[in-house]
Structure formats: C-alpha cells, structure tokens
Design a protein with these regions (language model features):
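Active-site neighborhood of divalent metal-dependent phosphoester bond hydrolases
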Residues: 56-114, 137, 142-145, 149-153, ...
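N-terminal active-site segment of His-dependent metallophosphoesterases
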Residues: 1-56
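Glycine-rich phosphate-binding loop signature in dinucleotide/nucleotide-binding domains
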Residues: 25-30, 116-117, 182-184
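Active-site neighborhood of phospho(di)ester-bond hydrolases with catalytic His/Asp-centered motifs
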Residues: 8-9, 33-38, 42, 60-64, ...
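Active-site environment of divalent metal-dependent phosphoester hydrolases
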Residues: 12-17, 41-43, 65-71, 129-130, ...
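Beta-strand-turn-beta hairpins that frame and shape the catalytic cleft
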Residues: 1-6, 114-122, 200-204, 228-229
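Anionic-ligand binding region
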Residues: 135-142, 173-198, 203-204
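Acidic, His/Gly-rich catalytic cores of divalent-metal-dependent hydrolytic chemistry
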Residues: 197-268
C-alpha cells in the first residue's frame, strides 16, 4: 500500500514556520503528519502553535520540551542549575496553554512504531530517552551512533545520574520505542539536535532531521517519507523577520536565545 507521511520536528513554538510548512503540504496528498517533538519550548507562541497542530491533526511525539511541561521542570535539576531561563520558559509555556492544549501535550506518545511495506520504522525525538538519560542525550555530536545501542528500559536505570532516578522509574512505565532495541527496527527517524545526519548501524538506518522552526537556515523545513523508504526534504520560505519582530515585542523567558536562533541561526 502506498503511504505518504509528513515529518516535522523542533518547531519550538515558531507558529509562522509551522503555518508555512502546513500550507506547502496541502497539495501533496499527505496521509498523516507526525511531529518528532519539541513543538513547544523557547518561542513566544506556544498556544497558537499547539492549536494549529490540533486543528491539523498532527500526531506529536514528546521531546524534552514536552517533558518539561508534562513532568514539570523541577524533575530536571540541570535546568535550574545550568539554564534558569529555559527552566522559567517551561513554566511560562505551561501557563500559556489552554486545558485542551495541555491535554494534547500530555497525551503525546514518547515514540511511534510504523510498519510500511514491510519496513518497521521507529519515530521518536531522540533514540536515547530525553526524560532521564542526561549524559547520553546531551553529549551526542552526530558522529557516534553506537551510543544508541543501549536500551532505554530498567536494565539501564542504574547507569544514569542519581538525580534523575525518579524520572527513569516514570519513563520505565512507558519506555521509549516500547522498550525495544534499535535493531528491532529497519529505520529510526528523530529530531532533537536540529541538524541533518544519516547513519547506518548494522542494518538500521538512522535519520536525524533538521528542525522545522529552529534550524541553521532561514527556511522552515519538513520531510515526506514515501512508502517507508524515500525521505524527501522540503525547505519553505517564511517570514522569519516577522518572528524576530514578534519576539522583540513579546516578553517571555529565554527570548534572547530564541532571538539568536531566529535572526542569526545559531544553535545554542
């Protein structure tokens, strides 16, 4: 059966970028749209962004930005310790969302498994669990996919920082990739780092996608996966200067980081 899936990731409350890619998708006969996480966080328009996702039946997967809302930022001590503005942004983001929008975020799955034309595909924000793997999630440089070999279930909990032990217990009840090893899949597609990489580990294809709303480009980016095999990238012009102006005019935590990303396209 032919199937056409659109993939976005790391919108980061950039509603203008999301609007642009949705408009571009309209004539492409898309079956389903998946967001690979971080649809919120950083940007000034979390409510408008989530509303747009709901209205367009986007299936959103939880990333770390969603986890900061669903689990609460206090469950991630490194935020308050290392990035107080990101901590405050998580609280502010939560306060901007309506009950329906919060419900959408709370009910976002941590991963999705698809079988298309015999290909087993895992969709996630990152192949290591952003809810508790502090070390692995933040050190990846795009060069060492072997880091993804370990499982994300109770077998590994003791290896992680004690301060995130409670998070690991929560995550173990709803494990990333359903507790499977990456070798249980033919392909893993993910976001998180906002850069594009392609690796083959054993017989598994690992695709890292460019961010839709936060990327080293002035375009909004999305992908179409055709029949579980061909991954096509689309770059859509959008008014990022308007996003910069709106950022200047709105008062919200971590706005300087968002301005840097949008205007100068520097990632962290």
């Amino acid at each position: 059966m032919k199937k056409k899936i659109a993939l976005i990731t790391d919108v980061h409350a950039n509603v203008e970028a999301l609007q642009a890619v949705l408009l571009d998708m309209k004539d492409k006969n898309i079956d389903t749209i998946y967001s690979l996480g971080d649809i919120i966080g950083l940007g000034y328009a979390p409510s408008e962004t989530v509303r747009l996702a709901i209205d367009n039946n986007i299936i959103n997967i939880q990333g770390n930005a969603e986890a900061y809302v669903t689990m609460g930022p206090d469950m991630f001590p490194y935020l308050k310790r290392n990035n107080i503005e990101r901590y405050n942004n998580a609280i502010w983001t939560s306060e901007q969302l309506s009950a329906e929008e919060l419900d959408y975020i709370n009910n976002s799955p941590v991963s999705v498994e698809l079988v298309i034309n015999g290909n087993k595909i895992g969709l996630c924000h990152f192949p290591l669990d952003v809810r508790y793997d502090f070390i692995g999630v933040w050190k990846y440089d795009g060069k060492n996919p072997e880091e993804f070999l370990k499982r994300n279930t109770s077998d590994d909990i003791e290896k992680y920082k004690p301060e995130l032990y409670e998070n690991a217990k929560i995550a173990d009840k709803n494990p990333l990739l359903f507790g499977k090893n990456i070798f249980d899949f033919d392909r893993i597609i993910y976001g998180h780092y906002h850069f594009e990489r392609n690796h083959i580990l054993g017989n598994v294809i690992l695709d890292s996608l460019n961010g839709t709303g936060v990327a080293i480009t002035d375009k909004a980016i999305y992908y179409i996966l055709e029949n579980g095999a061909k991954l096509i990238k689309y770059e859509v012009p959008y008014d990022y200067e308007k996003v910069f102006r709106e950022t200047e005019e709105n008062d919200f935590p971590n706005k300087d980081t968002f301005k840097k990303v949008i205007r100068w396209r520097k990632l962290w």
